[in-house]
Amino acid sequence: MGESDRFCYVYSCDLDISVRLKIGSLEGKREQKSYKAVLEDPMLKFSGLYQETCSDLYVTCQVFAEGKPLALPVRTSYKAFSTRWNWNEWLKLPVKYADLPRSAQVALTIWDVYGPGKAIPVGGATVSLFGKYGMFRQGMHDLKVWPNIEADGSELTKTPGRTNSSASEDQMSRLAKLTKAHRQGHMVKVDWLDRLTFREIEMINESEKRSSNFMYLMVEFPCVKCDEKEYGIVYYEKDGDESTPISTSSEIVRVPDPQMSMENLVEIKHHKLARSLRSGPSDHDLKPNAATRDQLNIIVSYPPTKQLTSEEQDLVWKFRSYLTSQEKALTKFLKCVNWDLPQEAKQALELLGKWKPMDVEDSLELLSSHFTNPTVRRYAVARLQQADDEDLLMYLLQLVQALKYENFEDIKSGLEPTKKDSQGPMLESMTTSGINPETDSSQILSNPLPAVSSPAPPSKTKDGLDAETLEQDLCTFLISRACKNSTLANYLYWYVIVECEDQDTQLRDPKTHEMYLNVMRRFSQALLKGDKSVRVMRSLLATQQTFVDRLVHLMKAVQRESGNRKKKNERLQALLGDNEKMNLSEFEPIPLPLEPQVKIRGIIPEKATLFKSALMPAKLYFKTEDGGKYPVIFKNGDDLRQDQLILQIISLMDKLLRKENLDLKLTPYKVLATSTKHGFMQFIQSVPVAEVLATEGSIQNFFRKYSPSEKGPYGISAEVMDTYVKSCAGYCVITYILGVGDRHLDNLLLTKTGKLFHIDFGYILGRDPKPLPPPMKLNKEMVEGMGGTQSEQYQAFRKQCYTAFLHLRRYSNLILNLFSLMVDANIPDIALEPDKTVKKVQDKFRLDLSDEEAVHYMQTLIDDSVNALFAAVVEQIHKFAQYWRR
C-alpha cells in the first residue's frame, strides 16, 4: 500500500490532553454607529468604534455540547493593535479530548470595551469540533462572524461560522475543501505548483472577504504528529455502542417535609427572648449607656425608607420605655412590632398611649401602606386633628390617596341607610336615595338625599388609649373637617371626584374605585345633614360640577371645529357669548374650583383665546364678584395630576422655607385636575426666557426695559435683581430635588418684577427625554442675567442655593412621607417605578452627608450645571426645532 493511501488516526478517548485552539486574525470592517446612536447611548463614544486606530479587541472561547457549556470560557491576552487585528495566540481550553462528546462545538465571541468595566460583543461565530465524519478539525479555518451578538452555543446555532448562503462563500468553502484534501495527501504534491496555487487561493479568499459585508475570524486547529507522521483524531467512545436499558417511568422519590411551611422555631425563640415579653414591666427602668444611646439616636434619625435590621429592631424594643420621651422614635418602634403576636401587639398599643405625642408631619408616615393596624392609623388621625386647616390643605392630596390603605369595609359601614330601606342592603338604600352605583360620581352631589338617622357612637378601645381621641378613621376625619371649611370641602370634592372617574383604577382595582364612590356618598350625606351654610356648600359644589361640565362641552365643540386656530378662536368667543346656549358669560356667583376664595360670575368672551399647541388649551378671563378679572388656563384632553402634585410640593417647600425666614420669591401657581382628562391652571402674566432672549437680546435688557434704575446694579431696580437671583436659586434647588426633566428656555418664564419660574412638569423623578441632562437648569444666559460668574449677585445666588438645600434637607422626612403616600396614584412618572419613587427623591437629599459636605456637593452641582457644554448644544437643537415648528 502506498504512503499516500495510508490513513493514520488516534481515538479521541485515548487523548488525555487539553484541547488547544489558535486565534489568528480578524478581517473585515466594523460598521460605525451614527451620531444619533451616540446621542441615544452616550457610552458608545468610549467604545473602540470611535478610536482612530484598531480598537483593543479580545476573543473568548467556550466549548458547548447539547446547548450547555462544558467548561468556563477562556480569553486572549491583552494586545494593542495598530493597523489590523492579529492575535496569533494559542488558547488552552479547560476540557480534554477524551471528554469531548460528538456534538461538541466551540463558540468564539469577539468583544470590545464599552465604558468602565463593561464590554459589548463585536460578533460571534460557532463551529463544531468534529466534522460530519467524526474527524476532529485540523488546520486553518475562516469563520464567518455574525455582527453585534454573542456566539450561540445551542444545537441549532444562530451564529454558524461555516455556511453556504452565498456564491462567494461557496467559492471559499470549495477551496477550503481542496486545501484539506491536499493536506491529507489525497493530491499529488508538486512544490513549485503548490506555492503558486496557495498564493492564488489566498488572494481569492482575501478578495471574497473584502467584497463581503461580514467579518471573518481565522482560527487554526492543531495537527497531531508522531514520528513525523500526521494523525487524525477520530471521535470514539469506549462501549458507546452498547445499549443501556432505561426506565420510561419516573424514578423520582418524593419525601414529604412536614416542617417546610412551618416557622423556624429557633428564630421564634430568639424573637421572644429578645423582646422579653415576660419581663415587660422590668424594662421600664432600662437606661442605655453612652454607646447604646448614640446607636439609638442614629436609628431614630434614619429616613422613613430605611429598613431596620433585626438587631436594630431588638435594640429599639429593648429600650422602648426609654424612647417614649422621643416623639421621633415612635414610627421606628411601631416598625419593630410583630403585629401577628397578640401579646406583643398589646404591649405596643399600651405604649402608644404613653408615648410623647408625635409631630403632625411625622404622623403622615403612619397612614402609609406599611401600617395596617387600625388603632395605629386612628392615632395618626388623632394627631392630624391638631393641624390647622391651612396645614391640612397642604397634605390633603396625599391624605385622599391614603384612603387606599384604610379598611374599605369601615368606610362602607359609615354610609347611613335610609329610613325606608334601613334593613335592606346598602346597594338598595343608595339606589333609593337616588345614587345608583352605576351613576356618574359627579352626579352624587346633585342628587337629593333623604333625611337619615344618626350613626351609632364609636366603640371604646381597650388598649390603654384615650377612646375619644381615636374615634375617627381617616375618611370620617376628612369629611368632618371639610364640612367646617368650604376651601377644604372644595378640594376634597375635586380630589375624590378624580379618583372616582379614573377608568384605569376602575378596571384594575374595582374595590378601590367603589371605596372612593362610598367616600363621595358619605361626603354628600354629611353635607346634607349639616346646617344651612353646609347645605349651601353642597349646592355650590354641585353647581361647580355643572359649570365644569359645560366648560368641557364647550371645549369639545371648539376642538371639533374645522379650520385653523383663528377660526377656532372665533368659534370659542361666539359660543361663550351665547349665554342662552352655554350660560357661561353671566351666571350666579360660585367659588372658582381652582381657588375657591375667588367668587366668579362669568367669562369675558372677547378675551378668550387658544394657545398654540396640539390640545389647544384655552386662556379664559373670569369676572370676579368684586369686579376684577381672574385669568386661568383650561386644558381639555390632558391629565394634570402630575403637574398638580409637583406644584403642591413646590408650594409646600415655599411655605417651609418661609418658616425658616427664607423667601425665595417662588411662584407656585395653582393647578387643579377636575378629571383625568381636564383641569384648571392659574395663568401668570409672564414671558418665556427664550422669547426674552430673542426680542431683547438678554435678561438684563428685559429688566432694564421694564424696571430701570440708575442706582441699581446694571441699571436695573435692586428689588427686581434681588427677586431674580432668589427665584433662580429656589427653582434650581427644588427642580433638582424633584428630578424635573425636559428643561429648556421655553418652559422657563420670567415676569416683569424679576420672578423666574418653571412650567410643564411632564418629566419628573430623573426622567428626561434629552441625553446627558445637567443636574439643574442653569445656563449661561441665566448666569449672565445676574452679571456673570464673577458678580456679587452670582455669589449671592450660590449662597441662597446652599441655604435652601440645607433647610429642605431638614424637612426631608415630611417630603418623603408625602411621596410615599403617592406611590399608588396613577401619576405617569410615579407609576413607571412606584417602588423606587421615594428612593429617587431621598437620593437627591444626600442624607448620608453632613451639612458641610452637602454644601460642597451643591457647589459641585452648580459648577457642573453652569459648565455643561452638551446641555447648551441640546438647547440650540431645541431652539431650531421650535423655529421649524412655527
Curated annotation (Swiss-Prot):
Q: Where is the composition biased (Low complexity)?
A: 445-454
Report the enzyme's class at the first EC level: transferase
Cite the GO molecular-function annotations of the record.
Answer: 1-phosphatidylinositol-3-kinase activity; ATP binding
List residues of the C2 PI3K-type domain: 35-184
EC assignment: the record states 2.7.1.137
Q: Where is this region: Activation loop?
A: 758-779
- Outline the extent of the PIK helical domain: 283-519
Please state every residue range assigned to the domain named PI3K/PI4K catalytic: 604-870
- Region Disordered: list its residue ranges: 414-464
GO biological process terms, alphabetically, are: autophagosome assembly; cell division; endocytosis; pexophagy; phosphatidylinositol-3-phosphate biosynthetic process; phosphatidylinositol-mediated signaling; regulation of cytokinesis
Q: Where is this region: G-loop?
A: 610-616
Keywords associated with the record: ATP-binding, Autophagy, Cell cycle, Cell division, Kinase, Lipid metabolism, Manganese, Nucleotide-binding, Transferase
Region Catalytic loop, residue ranges: 739-747
Where is the sequence biased in composition, kind Polar residues?
Answer: 429-444
One matching Pfam family, short form?
Answer: PI3Ka
The cofactor(s) it depends on are: Mn(2+)
Task: State the function annotated in the UniProt record.
Answer: Catalytic subunit of the PI3K complex that mediates formation of phosphatidylinositol 3-phosphate; different complex forms are believed to play a role in multiple membrane trafficking pathways. Involved in the transport of lysosomal enzyme precursors to lysosomes. Required for transport from early to late endosomes.
Family statement drawn from the similarity comment of this UniProt entry? Belongs to the PI3/PI4-kinase family.
Cite the PANTHER family for this sequence: PHOSPHATIDYLINOSITOL 3-KINASE CATALYTIC SUBUNIT TYPE 3, PHOSPHATIDYLINOSITOL KINASE
**UniProt name for this protein:** Phosphatidylinositol 3-kinase catalytic subunit type 3
Q: Which organism's genome codes for this protein?
A: Xenopus laevis (African clawed frog)
Task: Give the gene that encodes this protein.
Answer: pik3c3
